[in-house]
Amino acid sequence: MAQPRRDDRREREERDSEFVDKLVHINRVAKVVKGGRRFGFAALVVVGDQKGRVGFGHGKAREVPEAIRKATESAKRDLIFVPLREGRTLHHDVGGHHGAGRVLMRAAKPGTGIIAGGPMRAVFETLGVQDVVAKSLGSSNPYNMVRATFDALKRQMHPKDIAAQRGIKYSTLQARRGTAVATEE
C-alpha cells in the first residue's frame, strides 16, 4: 500500500530546512508580443548547507516569488562539494573565470572574515566559509561573477588529493606546508 503524500512532503521540508538560500540578483525582463510588452522576472539564487555544499540556480516567472522558488529548486539540483580547511577557509589560493568575469580567492587567517563583494559574498556565506579574501576583476555582471566563483571553487583541492596526484605521502605535503608557514611568520 502506498504511503500518504503528507509524509513525503514533511520529509522534503526537513531536507530543505538544512539549506540556507540567498537571493543574489533579481531582474525585470520583458517579452515583446503583438499587443505590447509582457513583463516577467528573472532571479539568481545561491543555496548552501554552510558545511561545504553550495549551488546556484536561475529561475524565470511572471511573479517574483515564483521566479525565486524556481531558482532555489534549480540551485538545490546542482550542488557541488568544496573541501574547506578547518571548516572555515579555503585550502589554497585559486582563481576562476567565466566570460569576461574573473575572480581571485585566497585563504585567510582566523578572524579575517569574508572580504568579498556582492555575489561572491553570498556564495561564501552559504558555503560556510568564515575567512576568505576575494577579488573580482573584469565583468561585474552577477551571473558571470557567480559562475566564475563556482569555476574557482571547483578547482579547490584537498591536500590529500594533491598528495595522491603528485605520488607523495600526505604527511610529507603537510610537513612542507608547516615549514612554508613557519618561514612566512
UniProtKB/Swiss-Prot annotation:
* Keyword annotations from UniProtKB, A to Z: Ribonucleoprotein, Ribosomal protein, RNA-binding, rRNA-binding
Tell me yes or no: is rRNA-binding among this UniProt entry's keywords. yes
Pfam families associated with the record: Ribosomal_S5, Ribosomal_S5_C
Name any Gene Ontology BP term: translation
- MF terms (GO), sorted A to Z: rRNA binding; structural constituent of ribosome
Which InterPro entries has this protein been placed in? Answer: Ribosomal_Su5_D2-typ_SF (IPR020568), Ribosomal_uS5 (IPR000851), Ribosomal_uS5_bac-type (IPR005712), Ribosomal_uS5_C (IPR005324), Ribosomal_uS5_N (IPR013810), Ribosomal_uS5_N_CS (IPR018192), Ribsml_uS5_D2-typ_fold_subgr (IPR014721)
Does this UniProt record's set of keywords contain RNA-binding? Answer: yes
Q: Name one GO cellular component term.
A: small ribosomal subunit
All copies of domain S5 DRBM, residue ranges: 19-82
Q: Which family does it belong to?
A: Belongs to the universal ribosomal protein uS5 family.
Q: What is known of its domains?
A: The N-terminal domain interacts with the head of the 30S subunit; the C-terminal domain interacts with the body and contacts protein S4. The interaction surface between S4 and S5 is involved in control of translational fidelity.
Query: What role does this protein play?
Result: With S4 and S12 plays an important role in translational accuracy. Located at the back of the 30S subunit body where it stabilizes the conformation of the head with respect to the body.
**What is annotated about its quaternary structure and interactions?**
Part of the 30S ribosomal subunit. Contacts proteins S4 and S8.
- The entry's protein name is Small ribosomal subunit protein uS5
